[in-house]
Every structure is written in structure tokens, then in C-alpha cells.
Amino acid sequence: MFGKLKEKLLETASKITEKIYSKGEAEEVKEEKEEKSKISFTSLFKKEPKKEEVKKEKAEEEIKKSEIVKTEPSEKVEEAKEEIKEIKEEKEEKKITFFDRFGLTRAIKKVLKKEVVILEEDIEDVLEELEIALLEADVALEVVEKLIENIKNELVGRKISPDDNVEEITINAVKNAIKNILSQEKIDIEEIIKKNKAEGKPTVIVFVGINGTGKTTTIAKLAYKLKQKGYSVVLAAGDTFRAGAIEQLEQHAKNVGVKVIKHKPGADSAAVIYDAIQHAKARGIDVVLADTAGRQATNVNLMEEIKKVVRVTKPDLVIFVGDALTGNDAVYQAEEFNRAVNIDGIILTKVDADAKGGAALSIGYAIGKPILYLGVGQRYQDLIEFDADWMVRKLFGEEEFEFSTEREF
């Protein structure tokens, strides 16, 4: 996930660090750090049998027993001999130094010989390289420009003294620049559901996007997540245009354990969703998740239809579902849907297969709306809440995420 983007960001931080070291005429120094000692001072002079010595004695005992009874070496004896050999090899490898025994470690680090003030010209070439790399990673141009500006704001004019940790300063500067891009105002879907429930009405969420992004599957994933949290859910088969769309949603609903409200293929999408809302009101169901036909923004008739859906059903949220693998195309699509129906948030799918990370970095900033969830696999549980801090940690290799290869659909 985001491998190329991660590599370039870390490389940028490293190059800026080296620029600062060069300007500050940094020199390498050895330092000794005291860590929590694993042994007490008195134990240094106390003769106690070591674990490997005890193991060695036991192994030698096995060999002696075999010789006394004058039998052929058993498997156990052969294992004992092998164990003695391994212990000797380990002892050769583990040469404990004076520093090790006192819990001290020695490291080489660079220290500035003089104070440095970072100028724009000092880091300009590094940022130009980053700009090209980000564009190649499908990051939107306006986002690239903003990110470069953010890094400059973090670093240019900053004074760095010999006592400062240069690596920490540069990595934090890039992190903060990224976080600024990712931090859009959050939407708490659960809070909306709870508020509406207290008022005795369902929460209505309409999903929009083009074909092939995983919109219908995402609806099923969110239904599963909400059901796991104790909310009742009904699905509205508002995609009456695509062949097999209703059947696909029905199968997902069966797997997840929720009901679907549907009409015949070709029916009015707004009417289907309206009926689902009335059904939810009559039965006290908490949430209506409404599918709609995938459509290109250039298809005027279908875009007019989605405007009608939003106008008639008055949803609490309109969520755009985009494919992370399409990079800048996902950003363009989100912008078009936002112009048409004023979307409230974004769900990005197929993020587990996204090596570039351009869409994830760009889409929220480009339209000024938050990413709500990320689709990260092919199980109903593979929908995770988006968090800017988590994304930054992921981009800088500070947190790994285990993806499942299992498939449920």
C-alpha cells in the first residue's frame, strides 16, 4: 500500500537532512547511551552458571550415560552432541563487551558544528524532485503544489542549532505537510444515526460514483459494519439501470443479513429509494443505504437522475465511492459529482492494491470533503475508518497493516 509514495517521502526527508548537515559542516561523533541494564553491578563479579553451561552439562551427561551402557549412540545422544556444537558457536558469536554488560550502546551520529538557517535555495532542488515524483504517483497538481508550499512553510527560515535533532526536524516537517493536506473536517456517521434515531427517523445515505468502483460491494460492507455495531439496516436497490445490479445487491444483503427494497429493472431510482425510506420509517429501521446507477459525469441524463434522487429523498449524506487505483481520474470524478449533488464524504476502494497513493492523498483536499472509509480487501469486514494520523504513520513506515487475501464475494 502506497509503496512508491512512501519511498519518495522518506527519500525527500533524508536528502533535506543531508543538505542541512552539509550547510552546518556536520561532523560524525561517537556517543554512548545508557540504557536500562539487564544485569546489576554486583552480578558482574558473581560466578553463576550460565544457561548454556547448564545445557552443555546436561548434554554431556547424556553422552556419558550412553558410553557407560556401551550402546550405539541414540538419537537423543546425537542431538546432545549437536547442541554442544551450537552452544560453542553461539559463544563465539556473542562476545559481550564492557559496554554491553553495563547496558551501554555506542552509536555514530552527525552533529552540526554551527547554527544553520534554512533558505529556500537550500532545499529547492530536492523539492523539485519530489514534485515530479508526486505527479508520477498520480497526485493532483494542486495537491502537489500545496504540499511543496507546506514543506517550505515548515522549514524555510528555521534556525537549527547543534543541539537540535536534524533528522527529527525534517521528518516532522514532511509529516506535518502531509497531515495538513489530509486533515478535512470529519463526519461522524454514528453520531448522525444516533441523533436521527432519537428523533424517531432513519438515517438515509445515498452512494454515487461511476461503474466498476466497487460501490455496491462498499454498501454491503458498510451495512455489515453498522449491523455489527447494533444498528438495523435496509438497502435500497436504486441502481435500476445496470443489468444484474439488483441481483448483486440482493446477494450481498442475504450474506450480510439485511433486507432489500427493490422495483423492476428500469424503474425510477428516486421512487425505489423513497419506498425504502418509508419502509424504514414504518418499521423503525435505523439506516437506509441507497445504491444508485454508476454513471460518467459526461452522461447528462444520468447526472440529472442523480440530482432528482437527492432532491426527492433528501438524504442525510451523499457519499462518493472512488477507485484508488484510478488516481487522478478518481479526483476528477469526485469533483464532477460534487458539483452536481454536493457530496458529503468519500469512500476509496481497492486501497490495499494501490502502490502509488495519489488518490488517497489528493481526493479529500481537491474537493474539500473528508475521506470516511477505505476499502482494503474482499471481505465484508474489510472497510476501515480513515484517519489522517494513521495514514501519515503508514506513509512513513511507522505502522504496518496486514491485509487479508481471503475472499467472501
From Swiss-Prot:
Chain segments annotated as transmembrane: none
InterPro entries linked: AAA+_ATPase, P-loop_NTPase, Signal_recog_particl_SRP54_hlx, SR_rcpt_FtsY, SRP/SRP_N, SRP54_GTPase_dom, SRP54_N_sf
PROSITE patterns registered for this protein in UniProt: SRP54
Name of a matching Pfam family: SRP54_N
Any one annotated GO CC term: cytoplasm
Keyword annotations: Cell membrane, Cytoplasm, GTP-binding, Hydrolase, Membrane, Nucleotide-binding, Receptor
Record-level Gene Ontology MF annotations: ATP hydrolysis activity; GTP binding; GTPase activity; signal recognition particle binding
Cell membrane among keywords: yes
Role summary: Involved in targeting and insertion of nascent membrane proteins into the cytoplasmic membrane. Acts as a receptor for the complex formed by the signal recognition particle (SRP) and the ribosome-nascent chain (RNC).
Subunit note: Part of the signal recognition particle protein translocation system, which is composed of SRP and FtsY.
Name the UniProt record assigns to this protein: Signal recognition particle receptor FtsY
Organism expressing this protein natively: Methanocaldococcus jannaschii (strain ATCC 43067 / DSM 2661 / JAL-1 / JCM 10045 / NBRC 100440)
This protein's encoding gene: ftsY
